[in-house]
């Protein structure tokens, strides 16, 4: 459904690399996630796939259409929800939806079944201007507008950034329903916890793909054992654990340190006690996708 082969993109006359030889494919009906921080290249990739930006090199197709030669067909077949709210803020909810339906030669009534579950949540506010909606409602309106012409592929660029936790959960529940309708979804997010909600993910950093697999596959590839180390003074603990001779990696995760060791750490507690930490907890834990991402950055 989506294929990319050796896609490259640079800015500022080649001095800034956005995408470096990117290749992967997304199957029909798949919910595929691009996971990475700001500046990883996710938006550049979305803009290329939605025919808004030309790659410097490589080939890409969407629903069997080339992103350069067949850009008109692609624009009729895809729905795109950019990271920044881009609807007309001075138009009402209903006016925005009617506008996008008209642009694609359809009506709200014709494809209402597809957007029904989403639109019903904002329909009571259909006469409210889009600029006056909450963050969660703006996202639901933007998703409705992206779906109104019944696209075969949906591109969502960081759709839950800046949205409250409840709205984030609701949004991903909506994506699961859309997947059941047979729509192929490519979604990007900086939130590592959302990666587990995708069928497959690509971990992206500075224009490079670090790993592509199912979320469980990414986690299972983590080498060695991972431990959570806690004590009262986390800042001092971080310095002391990193200075321990057997420490391989050590990163702060909330109130704990996630640590791997290059050799057995039987005397770590004694070492930390000698540094003044009296309430040390060392527990073996399962790695998360975020742990795997940090490991791959080394």
Label each region the model flagged.
Residues 1-7:
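Conserved N-terminal strand/loop that marks the beginning of ABC ATPase nucleotide-binding domains
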Residues 9-187, 192-197, 201-204, 211:
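ABC transporter nucleotide-binding domains
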Residues 75, 116, 219, 293-294:
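Conserved protein kinase catalytic domain
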Residues 116, 195, 240-242, 272-276:
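Hydrophobic C-terminal alpha-helix "anchor/cap" residues
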Residues 173-261:
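ABC transporter nucleotide-binding domain
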Residues 260-298:
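C-terminal coupling/interaction segments
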């Amino acid at each position: 459904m989506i294929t990319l082969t050796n896609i490259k993109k640079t800015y500022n006359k080649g001095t800034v690399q956005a995408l470096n030889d990117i290749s992967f494919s997304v199957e029909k009906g798949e919910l595929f996630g691009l996971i990475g921080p700001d500046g990883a290249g996710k938006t550049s990739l979305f803009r290329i796939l939605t025919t808004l930006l030309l790659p410097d090199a490589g080939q890409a197709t969407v629903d069997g259409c080339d992103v350069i030669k067949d850009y008109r067909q692609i624009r009729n077949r895809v729905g795109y929800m950019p990271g920044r709210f881009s609807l007309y803020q001075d138009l009402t909810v209903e006016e925005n939806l009617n506008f996008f339906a008209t642009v694609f030669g359809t009506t709200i009534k014709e494809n209402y079944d597809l957007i029904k579950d989403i639109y019903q949540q904002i329909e009571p506010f259909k006469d409210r201007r889009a600029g006056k909606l909450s963050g969660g409602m703006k996202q639901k309106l933007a998703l409705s507008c992206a779906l109104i012409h019944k696209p075969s592929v949906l591109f969502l660029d960081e759709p839950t950034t800046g949205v409250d936790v409840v709205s984030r959960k609701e949004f991903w529940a909506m994506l699961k329903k859309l997947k059941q309708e047979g729509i192929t979804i490519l979604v990007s997010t900086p939130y590592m916890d959302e990666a587990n909600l995708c069928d497959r993910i690509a971990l992206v950093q500075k224009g490079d793909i670090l790993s592509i697999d199912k979320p469980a596959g990414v986690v299972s590839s983590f080498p060695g054992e991972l431990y959570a180390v806690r004590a009262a003074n986390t800042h001092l603990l971080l310095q002391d654990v990193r200075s321990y001779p057997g420490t391989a990696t050590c990163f702060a995760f909330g109130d704990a340190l996630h640590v791997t060791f290059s050799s057995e750490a039987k005397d770590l507690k004694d070492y930390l006690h000698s540094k003044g930490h009296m309430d040390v907890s060392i527990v073996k834990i399962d790695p998360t996708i975020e742990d795997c991402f940090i490991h791959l950055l080394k």
